[in-house]
Amino acid sequence: AEAEKAGMSAVDYTVKSLKEGSLRFAAEQPENGKNHPRNLFIWRSNLLGSSGKGHEYMLKYLLGTEHGIQGQDLGKQGGVKPEEVEWQDNGLDGKLDLVVTLDFRLSSTCLYSDIVLPTATWYEKDDMNTSDMHPFIHPLSAAVDPAWESKSDWEIYKGIAKSFSALCVGHLGKETDVVTLPIQHDSAAELAQPLGVKDWKKGECDLIPGKTAPHIIPVERDYPATYERFTSIGPLMEKIGNGGKGIAWNTQSEMDLLRKLNYVKADGPAKGQPMLNSAIDAAEMILTLAPETNGNVAVKAWAALSEFTGRDHTHLALNKEDEKIRFRDIQAQPRKIISSPTW
């Protein structure tokens, strides 16, 4: 809104404001009430019990509860303080207003949570997994219904999206957020400053998004359409394609296949897009779009890499070009992945 009033694009206005100092990065003022998180959703992690690195600090600063911190902070130690972050002698405790945890066991995190959503466990949900430790795709299959009030992870988040979409009407509509994207490895931006990194804030260079600073990207959020978007595949797959690690390829044929497999949205904001009504639909989307489970996509991915290297790499997947692994396939037998340049 401020950018529109100034007659500037969101990116140009953000750059101008950062250079003037009227706008700052949230990381520069971590104790500012507008900058720290208020809500925390925890999924498949005992964050406050074992998997959080330095979880005692989370107990103090995020929850404001009893903790076991024994060391003193830098201010009391007389240590070197950060130069680009505003220092507060007394940091805020208990920054979070809400903690929601999805788990099938009563972990330490559940004990600290405001709301615990009981999720389905093994043999109660359809899902899949793999690992960089082996080359196979494994299924999780629902043999029985989830116990008592528990639901699968997919159904829980789908329900949250549906309720949020209904409640936000009249409060939130289409909003534009300005987000920053760090300079990514395996991308052209990785060579943005090939002769040495300079700091725009110290006046060593100009602030150029994607070169001397993060990418600055305006993103439109259609909040009332959250549920429709959650349960469908968006249009960008057909507009810009799929990819990773600096390469991309066309996905039109895969999107057409998913329209036949999952059917399409008949109306609403996602009209005509492939549906994701169930966990199996979501699994089929992954299996169809991933080069590791779709031979035709693997060939396209290797061809995309060939454009950069000048050598033909498609022979690495040509013998699997006609192989398309479906969810029912891995239910019958775990399947070996196809060679891919992005894995």
Could you tell me what each predicted segment is?
Residues 1-101, 106-343:
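Domain-level signature for respiratory redox metalloenzymes
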